[in-house]
UniProtKB/Swiss-Prot annotation:
InterPro entries: SecE_bac (IPR005807), SecE_sf (IPR038379), Translocase_SecE/Sec61-g (IPR001901). This is Protein translocase subunit SecE. GO terms for molecular function: protein transmembrane transporter activity. PANTHER family: PROTEIN TRANSLOCASE SUBUNIT SECE. GO terms for cellular component: plasma membrane. Its main location: membrane. The keyword Plastid does not apply. Belongs to the SecE/SEC61-gamma family. It holds the Pfam family SecE. Component of the Sec protein translocase complex. Heterotrimer consisting of SecY, SecE and SecG subunits. The heterotrimers can form oligomers, although 1 heterotrimer is thought to be able to translocate proteins. Interacts with the ribosome. Interacts with SecDF, and other proteins may be involved. Interacts with SecA. One of its GO terms (biological process) is protein targeting. Essential subunit of the Sec protein translocation channel SecYEG. Clamps together the 2 halves of SecY. May contact the channel plug during translocation. Keywords: Cell inner membrane, Cell membrane, Membrane, Protein transport, Translocation, Transmembrane, Transmembrane helix, Transport.
């Protein structure tokens, strides 16, 4: 029974490797095709690149890692829905606080800079 379980990952691994090679070949074909068919219209080349990238994503999605990535994306989307987003009022208040603190810090640094310039001028006799 363990021998059967050991064979399944190897065949799956080989299939995944073949799928990743196919994905890479499709992406290289998109880049090379875009370069070689430079005389065609931009729309035709863009359509070709989009089709090849979509095909590459489709092939990659059938691999083990691709399926894991799809599950991760779905779970991430569900987590984003659970986030409690701030109201417009909270957003505006926070933005104004950040703006006020930035202005105060800018004025403080400007003042410190002015004092330092005068101290250096006094020390050097300029």
């Amino acid at each position: 029974m363990k021998a059967n379980n050991a064979e399944a990952p190897d065949s799956s691994n080989a299939a995944d490797t073949l799928k990743w090679v196919a994905t890479f070949v499709l992406l290289v074909a998109a880049v090379v095709g875009n370069y070689l068919y430079g005389e065609l219209s931009v729309v035709a080349r863009a359509a070709g690149v989009i089709v090849l990238i979509a095909a590459a994503l489709g092939v990659a999605a059938t691999t083990t890692k691709g399926k894991e990535a799809i599950v991760f994306a779905r779970e991430s989307r569900m987590e984003v829905r659970k986030v409690v987003w701030p109201t417009r009022q909270e957003t505006m208040q926070t933005t104004l606080i950040v703006l006020a603190v930035s202005i105060v810090m800018a004025l403080a640094l400007w003042g410190i800079d002015g004092i330092m310039v005068r101290l250096v001028a006094f020390a050097t006799g300029v």
